[in-house]
Amino acid sequence: MGELGEHRSRSSLLSIPVLDTKTSGGSEYRESDGSLDLQSTLFEDHWLQSSQATTERNTDDPEEEIPPEEMVGEELPEVSNLEDSLRRDLEVEVVGMSHLSINERTTPTTSSAKCRKKKNHRLLELAKPKFNWQCLKDRTGRCCKGHVWISPRKTNLQFCLYWPSVYWTERFIEDTTLTITVPEVSRRVEELSRPKRFYQEYYNNNRTTPIWPIPRSTLEYQASNRLKRLATPKIRNNIWSINMSEVSQVSRAAQMAVPTPRTLRLAKPRAPATLLEEWDPMPKPKPYVSDYNRLLQLATPKALSEKCVPDRSPQWEVLNVTKNAVASSRIISLAQPKIRKDLNEGYNPYYISPASLVAQASPRIYELAVPKHITKKV
């Protein structure tokens, strides 16, 4: 890397007089143009050959990458040879183009070589066939319920689920070799995995022995004093058996205390709350009750005075015209009371109007008239 930095500094120093010659005149630049073009083409060809060699090495082994230190070390002698040749040409007749222009020309070639390298690497990746995850090979596998998935680069034993990206329609191949052992299940897990119904039918049927054996270490374990104290049930006091005279003992100071008038007033019981009628500020009128004696007084007819002379006598004679009068048919019909029928008297529930008898039913009405379910007679 140090040599590459020195090479860049030398090339920059060499490019300074070239810029002065460009400003001074263009005749010498035209004369040296042909020789510089030839050298630039040779430099580009040599550069392309080195880049193609590196790409061929990458295509042979795409996974191995050459470190940048080795690449720089291989290119440094070639660059030094080019620098010596340029010095000789500049001393003789070359005063046109600097090493900086050569670098400017070679920069697109380096970028194109990198792009070409990436494209080749990508094409090699795409050219590889997709891995069949269902093929049984001597590789690290994963087993789950009789099915196996092969992992090409996994070495740690973990239960991973690998879904195939292409073979969706194919069924998983059952692992008949049984290369991976299933972990052993303890009796405790088996008992816990059984359904609740099995427990109710089997273990609740007058069973005296425990479900699973108790280990000897548990039986021989000696409980500490703290555990024994915590295991002792608490003794709760029965409040109904306590003598209340002991609880409600009044101190001597309270017995000798003299209450204030305020305390005596507060000690008196409160008067009951007033009723709703008493709270109403507007008095309501009393309900009306008729006076029976007044009714009897009003019902008694007035007594006529002896000096009262009536207009006519309350008894008078009926005329002969009235006695011989004959009632007409209209008067007789009006004199008869109205005859009222009962609720259902004269009602015919099966009466059909003549318009309904003449009506024609539409196909939709026939469709709606068909019953949904026809019950068969037993």
Curated annotation (Swiss-Prot):
A single Gene Ontology CC annotation of this entry is:
nucleus
UniProt biased composition (Polar residues): 47-56
Q: Which InterPro entries match?
A: SPMAP2-like (IPR042401), THEG (IPR006623)
Q: Which UniProt keywords apply?
A: Developmental protein, Differentiation, Nucleus, Phosphoprotein, Repeat, Spermatogenesis
**Gene Ontology BP terms:** cell differentiation; spermatogenesis
What start and end residues bound the annotated signal peptide? none
Q: Where is this region: Disordered?
A: 1-35, 47-79
Please list the residue ranges covered by the THEG repeats. 113-132, 179-198, 217-236, 253-272, 285-304, 321-340, 355-374
Q: In the UniProt record, does the keyword Cell division occur?
A: no
Any idea which residues bear Phosphoserine here? Answer: S290
Where is this gene product found?
Answer: Nucleus
SMART domains (UniProt xref): THEG (SM00705)
Protein purpose = May be involved (but not essential) in spermatogenesis.
UniProt protein name: Sperm microtubule associated protein 2
